[in-house]
């Protein structure tokens, strides 16, 4: 098991830790350490009750007050979960192709200058989490993120950048892919579990088959993984039991697969897994009934893209086809099998944010969109690179129409290099 905890820049691994401090400073630090180790006059139970009411964004500051507070932080998460004092936290996987590793980021939400009813948003890098293999499948469950499969190889390194040439856990199993790819590339069967409470990760049992760009969904406490390879074995669908921590195969028959059996995107609605393959055909799997349904055309396949999310069993998607005509978001109802427009949205940015990479996520019932934007400042190559965050609340009226309200629009990251938002997802901590 690999276990890595986040450390500060001035930790013991820094380059100056061998420099001897003056004796006066050592004595002062020793006295301060003895002082903070004294038992607090307030009972621990009472301190925990007070901490339960503190927003998670302030926990790092609290843990630095003294060692006693730091030790209480680990107990705090379980109590918050038990009492229902949880928060939604947005994680993003941001790439900097082709010169720098992609990295995990967390969206920090803090009161702006301690002013009431004001929130400052900022994407902060998480150094303790490793980059993912290209083509990995990602699902979130509670406070956990699961990274499944992917593809590695030297040719892939040249095509998409330095961050995608290694599996997270070292690549225990894989297969070389030549047809439909490049010699030297290989799919992997690795599975990694990320604990978002403490930003730690560990390896889980590998899948039976190596996969890349598979579809996945969580239903009844189990992770179903579909495709990511051609339909030619009995292991085209596998299921991971979270309690038993083991994989098993789901028997066929399977639907007719097109191309390499890989998928552009996927979603879970009404406890069914919807998959959009590379030729824009829809495959729907019902795990409870062990039934498949496939569409070769229709409204869903025509407008669905990988920048989408599901809220209340409805599929929300950026409407790229008519974005500049005032209808930036569409909603697909799986029961009525039709699309609706999200009306309202005064204040939605109209400066071409969605020309390049962007991702949408369900944030506690609201919509959050992260978009990498490049503004040309001059006639030549000088550009201002930004990642924007748009938060949207929405409701369904009695007449069946959908209305949205833009709650905030903010720049959350201004990197020095061109960026792309590869993944955007929410966990509960």
Swiss-Prot record:
Gene3D superfamilies: Kelch-type beta propeller
Organism from which the protein derives: Arabidopsis thaliana (Mouse-ear cress)
Domain F-box residue range list: 37-84
Region (Disordered): 1-32
Record-given protein name: Putative F-box/kelch-repeat protein At2g21680
Kelch repeat start-end pairs: 144-175, 176-221, 222-267, 269-313, 315-359
Repeat as UniProt keyword: yes
Keywords carried by this UniProt record: Kelch repeat, Repeat
Native organism taxonomy: Eukaryota, Viridiplantae, Streptophyta, Embryophyta, Tracheophyta
InterPro entries: F-box/kelch-repeat_ARATH, F-box_dom, Kelch-typ_b-propeller
Biased segments, Basic and acidic residues type: 17-29
């Amino acid at each position: 098991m690999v276990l890595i905890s986040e450390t500060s820049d001035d930790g013991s691994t820094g380059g100056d830790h061998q420099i001897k401090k003056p004796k006066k400073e050592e004595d002062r630090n020793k006295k301060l350490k003895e002082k903070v180790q004294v038992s607090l006059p307030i009972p621990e139970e009472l301190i925990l009750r007070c901490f339960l009411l503190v927003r998670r964004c302030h926990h790092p500051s609290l843990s630095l007050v003294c060692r006693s507070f730091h030790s209480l932080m680990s107990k705090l998460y379980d109590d918050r979960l038990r009492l229902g004092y949880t928060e939604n936290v947005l994680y993003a996987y941001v790439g900097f192709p082709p010169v720098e590793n992609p990295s995990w980021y967390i969206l920090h939400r803090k009161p702006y200058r301690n002013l009431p009813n004001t929130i400052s948003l900022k994407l902060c890098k998480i150094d303790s989490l490793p980059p993912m293999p290209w083509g990995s499948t990602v699902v979130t469950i509670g406070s956990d993120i699961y990274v499944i499969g992917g593809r590695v190889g030297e040719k892939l390194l040249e095509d998409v950048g330095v961050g995608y040439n290694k599996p997270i856990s070292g690549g225990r199993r894989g297969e070389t892919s030549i047809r439909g790819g490049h010699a030297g590339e290989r799919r992997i069967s690795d599975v990694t579990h990320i604990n978002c409470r403490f930003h730690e990760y560990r390896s889980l049992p590998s899948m039976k088959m190596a996969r890349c760009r598979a579809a996945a969904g969580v239903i009844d406490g189990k992770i179903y993984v579909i495709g990511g390879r051609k339909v030619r074995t009995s292991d085209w669908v596998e299921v991971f039991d979270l309690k038993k921590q083991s994989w098993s195969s789901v028997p066929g028959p399977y639907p007719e697969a097109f191309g390499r059996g890989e998928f552009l995107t996927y979603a879970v609605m009404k406890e069914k897994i919807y998959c959009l393959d590379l030729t824009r055909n829809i495959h729907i799997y019902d795990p409870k009934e062990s039934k498949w349904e496939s569409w070769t055309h229709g409204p869903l396949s025509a407008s669905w893209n990988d920048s989408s999310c599901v809220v209340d069993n409805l599929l929300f998607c950026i409407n790229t086809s008519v974005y500049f005509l005032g209808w930036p978001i569409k909603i697909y109802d799986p029961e009525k099998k039709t699309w609706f427009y999200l009306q309202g949205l005064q204040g939605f940015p109209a400066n071409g944010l969605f020309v390049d990479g962007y991702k949408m996520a369900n944030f506690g019932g609201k919509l959050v969109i992260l978009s990498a934007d490049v503004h040309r400042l001059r006639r030549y190559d000088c550009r201002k690179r930004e990642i924007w965050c748009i938060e949207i609340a929405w409701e369904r009226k009695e007449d069946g129409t959908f209305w949205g309200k833009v709650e905030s629009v903010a720049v959350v990251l201004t990197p020095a290099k061109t960026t792309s938002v590869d993944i955007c997802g929410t966990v509960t901590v």
